[in-house]
Regions:
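Buried hydrophobic packing segments
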Residues: 22, 109, 144-145, 169, ...
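Conserved phosphate/pyrophosphate-binding and hydrolysis machinery centered on Walker-type P-loop NTPases
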Residues: 8-16, 38, 158-162, 181-185, ...
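Mixed-charge, glycine-rich, non-catalytic linkers/tails in nucleic-acid processing enzymes
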Residues: 1-9, 149-159, 302
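Conserved catalytic core of nucleic-acid polymerases
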Residues: 86-87, 91-94, 170-304
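Flexible glycine/proline-rich, aromatic-decorated loop/lid segments
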Residues: 111-116, 160-167, 259-263
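Conserved alpha/beta core surface patches that mediate binding of polyanionic ligands
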Residues: 110-122, 127, 288, 292-300
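Conserved "right-hand" nucleotidyltransferase catalytic core of DNA-directed polymerases
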Residues: 1-114, 124-131, 138-141, 201, ...
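Conserved catalytic alpha/beta cores of large enzymes that bind or transform nucleotide phosphates
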Residues: 120-145, 156-189
């Protein structure tokens, strides 16, 4: 279909050949040009989706190719003679203490797209007598943040079972909860999660498609509505500078030598780490404790189940 629509026979996965076809043969408006030719990365192509019918086909082809190479071919290589896949779960590879998965990474199986969800169907129980069960905490990092910062507005929203992103949008935009639009909620969601990761106005602006000034104002409004969160974040950075480390709620430390760097970017990274490590690390601690308790309960009850 790509060859028919473009009128050219070429290697779709070659950025150089694709650039020539799109920008020279078809005359589409060229974006950035690199030393090796025209840039054909996802951002450039997304901006050209409506310019020519071949562009969405190329994006779709790339998505299919990635899914096949990473998940179909990749998982087949790692499955044993009985069709089982055994991942490696790492306890202490990530700096925040989150569990990570490798060979294959089973924490990264796609779910956002329809085709990605099909990939999940390859994981099935060993027989008709067994089930695969999964469980997850709802908004655990934001709940941890609300607790550690003792932010009453956010705690109140969680205790009432409200949609935290809609509640944040209502707080920041100054509108009743039932007047929050999907766009408002989407922006508030980006800020809620961004705060956990120490997002900057530049990063937020890019995420939600607004100017840097608007993003800065949004963050300022957020902290005005949730003042204890700002105080808590500042106290984490102070602790990092004074002690050289920050801790989770359970006392697990992360050393932050970056905070004493003379390089501004390195120091800024250290400050973001000081803000997000106690939150992400505490959430990781809670999940690990829960996993141990579940495993103990399964053994104690003599259930034919594995965690």
């Amino acid at each position: 279909a790509i060859y028919e629509v473009s009128g050219e026979n070429f290697n779709v996965l070659s950025p150089k050949q694709l650039g020539v076809v799109l920008f020279e043969k078809l005359g589409l408006p060229a974006g950035r040009k690199t030393k090796s030719g025209y840039s054909t990365d996802a951002e450039v192509l997304e901006n050209l989706v409506s310019a020519h019918p071949v562009v969405p086909l190329v994006l779709q082809y790339r998505a299919f190719t990635k899914l096949k190479s990473t998940y179909v071919d990749g998982l087949l290589k790692l499955s044993d003679e009985n069709g089982f896949i055994h991942t490696t779960l790492n306890q202490t590879v990530t700096v925040t203490g989150r569990i990570s998965s490798a060979e294959p990474n089973l924490q990264n199986i796609p779910v956002r797209t329809e085709l990605g969800r099909v990939m999940r169907k390859v994981f099935v129980p060993r027989d008709g007598e067994h089930l695969l069960v999964d469980a997850d905490y709802s908004q655990i990092e934001l709940r941890v943040l609300a607790h550690m910062a003792d932010e009453k507005n956010m705690i109140d929203a969680f205790l009432k079972g409200e949609d935290i992103h809609a509640r944040t949008a209502a707080e920041v935009y100054g509108v009743p909860l039932d007047e929050v639009t999907p766009q408002m909620r989407s922006s508030a969601k980006a800020v809620n999660f961004g705060i956990v990761y120490g997002i900057s106005d530049f990063g937020l602006a890019k995420n939600i498609g607004v100017s840097r000034k608007e993003a800065r104002e949004f963050i300022e409004k957020y902290f005005a509505r949730y003042p204890r969160i700002k105080e808590y974040m500042d106290s984490c950075v102070r602790q990092g500078h004074e002690q050289g480390y920050v801790t989770t709620l359970f006392g697990r430390r992360r050393n932050l030598p970056e905070l004493s760097s003379s390089n501004y970017q390195t120091r800024s990274f250290g400050e973001r780490a000081a803000m997000n490590t106690p939150i992400q690390g505490t959430a990781a601690d809670i999940i690990k404790i829960a996993m141990v308790r579940v495993a103990d309960a399964l053994r104690r009850e003599g259930l034919e189940a594995k965690l």
